[in-house]
Amino acid sequence: FVMSALGAAVAGALLPTVLRAEQPLRILVLGGTRFLGPHMAEHALARGHTLTFFNRGKTNPGVLPSVERIQGDRNGQLDGLKGRKWDAVIDNSGYVPRHVRLSAELLKTSVPHYLFISTVSVYASFAAANDEDSPVGKLADATVEKVDGETYGPLKALSESAAREVYGPAATTILRPGLIVGPDDNTDRFTYWPARAARGGEFAAP
């Protein structure tokens, strides 16, 4: 059921209409206001689901004002989530395994399913095609929490493990998307290139 909600969010722009969910869900979104989150939320709302955002309230605080907000911090300031129940949680802002473990442990008894948005960057190598069982990158120091180009993938892999360890494989869904592009992409990792190519002439490309 969570996959259908997220699938509508990620692929909904390709659909002529958004189908209403047979069983509307109460969904908690950790993060949810930067790039992917608002698109996901709009389509989940269109399907009839009820959303709650949990975040620090700093990034795009005015986006989707009709959605309930609980302000807090992944770094231990989770009190606003206590005593509440949802049908599923979508972790859209988990980059450090300690943060993922904290939220998963708090929510395990009140939210039956944990969906973690990971990344293809978890894989140790791209020399061959990867699948769910392919080796993931590892950190020399598992206590590192600084997120940069070298640690991003391994930290996401450790975060996946944290979610599974707390919720168990049956109640955990891990998504490993590749490069996501589209409206409001704040990274400009892809959109620059077709725009530059459309201008014509020679240009350097990676």
Question: Across the structure, where does each feature detected by a protein language model lie?
Answer:
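N-terminal export signals
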Residues: 1-21
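N-terminal Rossmann NAD(P)H-binding glycine-rich loop of SDR-like oxidoreductase domains
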Residues: 30-47
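NAD(P)-cofactor binding segment of oxidoreductase domains
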Residues: 84-140, 157-165
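Conserved Rossmann-fold cofactor-binding substructure of NAD(P)-dependent oxidoreductases
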Residues: 71-86
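A conserved pocket-lining segment of Rossmann-fold NAD(P)-dependent short-chain dehydrogenase/reductase
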Residues: 144, 195-206
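Flexible, glycine-rich beta-alpha linker
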Residues: 173-194
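Active-site Tyr-X1-5-Lys
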Residues: 143-173, 189
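N-terminal Rossmann-fold cofactor-binding loop
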Residues: 54-58
